[in-house]
Amino acid sequence: QLNYDPTVAPMDAYCLYWLVNLAVGVPLDGYYTDAANALGDKTPAEAEEVINTLKTLDFNTIDTVAIMYDATDYLSGNAMYSDENPTDPTQFTGNLEASIEVLQNYYPQIRIIVMSPTYAYAVDENGDYVSSDMYIYNGRDVLSTYVIKECYSANIHSVSFMDNLYGSITEDNADEYLVDNLHLNVKGRKLIAKRFEY
């Protein structure tokens, strides 16, 4: 069990790992109070609603949990994985794997579907949109490698994986579905929802 330190990275309180722990009943109220105090007006607008929902939702009544990452980890140059500790929640895939393990331990009956990021443009030093298959942040890797690692993490935990990077919003059609380099427009959201139905 890691301890959360709001003085280092207060936004981490809202990452998947800590939210899943909150959902299974780990008492984390102090974490979120500390995070909100540290973030001030940068606290996510929906934070209180999400926290209250996760604390009160009966996951014994839930059939399926869908987990969808966008390309923020790639765009931020966050660390992707650790061979020494594959469930290190400070890593992109470690956070996912640790979260899946918590859900599977507490609610083995729930089907978990991991949904990959859709395509997102990288932004170069001049502020121009460039291919995320060509641009690397913080010496990490390209967006497609994040997705490949995410798929691997889903597979080793025997959960479903939905590939949005190549299966829905791609480099070829991204202009039609994004409002900027990352965020989906209404048409893009509908496309992902339609694909999720299958």
Question: What role is predicted for each listed range?
Answer:
Residues 63-68, 111-116, 157-160:
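Structural recognition of the beta-strand scaffold that forms the well-ordered cores
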Residues 82-90, 134, 180:
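The substrate-binding groove and active-site-proximal loops of carbohydrate-active enzymes
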Residues 99-103, 151:
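Hydrophobic positions in alpha-helices of CheY-like receiver
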